[in-house]
């Protein structure tokens, strides 16, 4: 089958969505399909640019290439998933969230514009009109599926995939640190972990790694670490190469991961692959699809006090932490989170 993966990317910005698309391309190729990935450059400012991109996507013809039919289109991200094709299947990573759950909140950068509401309504109308064109609609997590249903009235089945290099993760004896590998961004709430660390009764240490998305937030974290006198209990490693990151996973006592309203997030799955328990928050959403309180980790309220209590509990009972980590790995294996399953689902006749 000749398959085209349709996605979007902000030029020179690389994250989980890009790794997701590459993983899908590799899995389809390994299954014997001929695959091409098309990434539309995405720019969301000024807001009217979004309308131009919706129109441009709808005008694309991807039914054939050089006279050869394209058998299947798999759409991943807005606005690329709006491209018309008679045999299109959607595997939605996320919609344009500023038009949905981010609207009117701290993460909203659309409402401030005079035409923001008009653009929001146009995005919603396009999704509601054109997503149902697909033969089948899947989401990369239950959270994304629930958001699609809530705002657009569209049903989507969650279809899970493994993180990059899943087969390379291992577990090692736990050392004296908790690990938080994630982009430095307010939505990942590293600052909340710092505040919690200051309230811990146990001598908890936290190791942070990840690229900086928000330089101001990175400075705020450093300032707060100094103000609270936590310099000897916080390691800020910056971006970590994949091999080094897997080694941190292998040797940590557990992973603390408190993002706000996460869609999927590789961190939880990577922790499970390394047989490490996860501390997350009750509003982290995506991680809650895998973190079961008192079974594979701990779920705390998103306050410094509650998070500190969870960190203390994990730190103070190493045997329990190991049992929760092993349970997480067993849960991952039972879920059959494999690329083979993904490929079979996305290429079957709908």
Positions of PLM-derived features:
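Conserved acidic donor-binding segment of nucleotide-sugar-dependent glycosyltransferases
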Residues: 293-305, 313-318
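A short, well-ordered alpha-helix in the C-terminal region of glycosyltransferases
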Residues: 306, 313, 320-335
